[in-house]
């Protein structure tokens, strides 16, 4: 009779345990393995449950269910850890014994009894968590029972975003009724079930910098837990330990051979059981591929399913684009190709297929996949929460192992770049001025009407889509970023409000100050918009290698001509050939006024640049004077 499989594996573990040695030094103590959910194995650096190990601000306590971490005297349960994005999903552990008799009607006992402020710690609340809170509809406290006895709960009901320091609600008005149950239920789920995401920046923390050097030297990272400064310590193994380790490695090799023989014997005895387990696991894996899709899990974690756009299957979009027929390709960029798709109901839509990055190394491929996934999810989260006539609308998405796809409005008349630099018909000055104003209105909406504000980061003539009636829509939000500031600066509109992030964008449009300082603000979009204005004036490309080196960037060329009083040398000659545009070219409120505005937009010091509201006001003033001038020319 064969031995039960559990006895074979128990005996194997017993043999390995006999020959194993117990580490005794501080370094081996810090590197010892132990189980600590939700980490798949031992918590990696910077986390540690041992005093003096890891990072002093990332000390955790392990339990059988979930690890906990204390940040600024608040204890949180760790629901999820992502090594790719350096983020944690936390749920606050509240005092279940606190007195809630006076607030029983509010049913708010499982939420924090004060706002969560991470200022002064390495952590910051992620953009996506702030975005989820900002969509909540506030309640009026005057319609709630016991509001005078529960001032904190009432403050939250007036502004739910207050519970996370730095997040605010996008809804300014208070609802008189019908919101309490929805709001409290959402907050209960937000903290107890889903949690909120926090991030940290390893590049700015000296502990991480020193730890990388320590690990290169085969050291173990820790700190002096007995000193107030908690100085970094790199634990190095002594010579005797290294010799012992080499001996142990030899012994482990022998043990491995014996163990392998023993394990094979057990596997032969329980072969039928192993086959059954394999078939069961394979069937379970195949049935759960779609359920475990990382993009779908990420989106459901950061946004309610009711707020997300519809989901298409890969087969639906493959059929709509005739298997991604090259003849249906209507655009191609750095992040993906765009195809014309026709759904079963006859609706025409644009299907954006993100690139696969074939032919790259394994490491580069994984990096590109992570970046594409982040860009994909980022565009879905932002576009699903905005609504403006001059911004493209997201109709749905598809996350499939075969590809990531986004379904947008199909704009039939190409891009602004097509009209200015190639395939499109000639554009009059009045049309160009209207396009400039519509683009500015879209930028104003992103910067001032959304909380937290959105920086597009890629406003270019290729991302401005033109409809048949010459109305425009700004698209491609893959690089967009939410600006989440602290409570002291959230109501400010100065350029000192910024987030630190790696420069991304299109050459020729990228803000040089952002490129140098890594500080992203709304004024970075203003710079890109200024380059688009220069394209409208000159008809030239933002970057043209056929021009002289000093004039290769359009911004440099136009700025130098304006400073020398030679603007007329770079004005699009097609404007001067059109009789209707003569007044605009010669009048001070026409092309010259827009050129002056573009000059201000690309100012070296971002404090000298106008904001989106100022740009809209100035363009409206210019347009009104231009129309008066056109009418005078028509009368004569």
Swiss-Prot record:
Entry superkingdom: Eukaryota
Subcellular locations according to the entry: Cell membrane
Binding positions for ATP per the UniProt entry: 330-338, 352
Recorded coiled-coil stretches: none
Record topology, Extracellular segments: 27-257
Active site: 458 (proton acceptor)
Glycan-modified residues: 73, 102, 146, 224
Membrane topology: Single-pass type I membrane protein
Cytoplasmic side stretches: 279-636
Protein kinase domain sequence ranges: 324-628
Signal peptide bounds: 1-26
Recorded GO MF terms: ATP binding; polysaccharide binding; protein serine kinase activity; protein serine/threonine kinase activity
Protein family (similarity comment): Belongs to the protein kinase superfamily. Ser/Thr protein kinase family.
PANTHER family linked: LEAF RUST 10 DISEASE-RESISTANCE LOCUS RECEPTOR-LIKE PROTEIN KINASE-LIKE 1.4, PROTEIN KINASE DOMAIN-CONTAINING PROTEIN
UniProt name for this protein: LEAF RUST 10 DISEASE-RESISTANCE LOCUS RECEPTOR-LIKE PROTEIN KINASE-like 1.5
Gene it is expressed from: LRK10L-1.5
